[in-house]
């Protein structure tokens, strides 16, 4: 059975495609994983920055807290 030139070219293309496809798929998965990791890191950094800003804005009136605690201690009989 003789192969025509076109059949030979198609066979070579098929073999090359079969050899290259797993490599391309693995590379695509690796790139997607790296992109997902980078996006998750960016989200975590944004949340941490927002939380730090929120905590920095909280003003605790320590004098009132102390008065409340001292008053509570006196109410139960402790100095």
UniProtKB/Swiss-Prot annotation:
It is found in: Secreted; Target cell membrane. It holds the Pfam family Pilosulin. InterPro entries: Pilosulin (IPR049518). The C-terminal amidation is important for antimicrobial activity, since a non-amidated synthetic peptide shows a reduced antimicrobial activity (2-20-fold depending on the strain tested). The amidation may play a positive role in the peptide conformation, since amidated peptide shows an increase of about 5% of helical content. Residues 27-56 form a propeptide. Expressed by the venom gland. Residues 1-26 form the signal peptide. GO terms for cellular component: extracellular region; membrane; other organism cell membrane. One of its GO terms (biological process) is defense response to bacterium. Antimicrobial peptide that shows antimicrobial activities against all microorganisms tested with minimal inhibitory concentrations (MICs) values ranging from 0.45 to 97.5 umol/L. This peptide kills the microorganisms by permeabilizating the membranes. It shows a very weak hemolytic activity (HC(50)=325 umol/L) and weak cytotoxicity against human lymphocytes (LC(50)=67.8 umol/L). Gram-negative bacteria tested are E.coli (MIC=24.4 umol/L), C.sakazakii (MIC=5.8 umol/L), P.aeruginosa (MIC=8.7-12.2 umol/L), S.enterica (MIC=5.4 umol/L), and H.pylori (MIC=0.99-3.9 umol/L). This is M-myrmicitoxin(01)-Tb1a. It comes from Tetramorium bicarinatum.
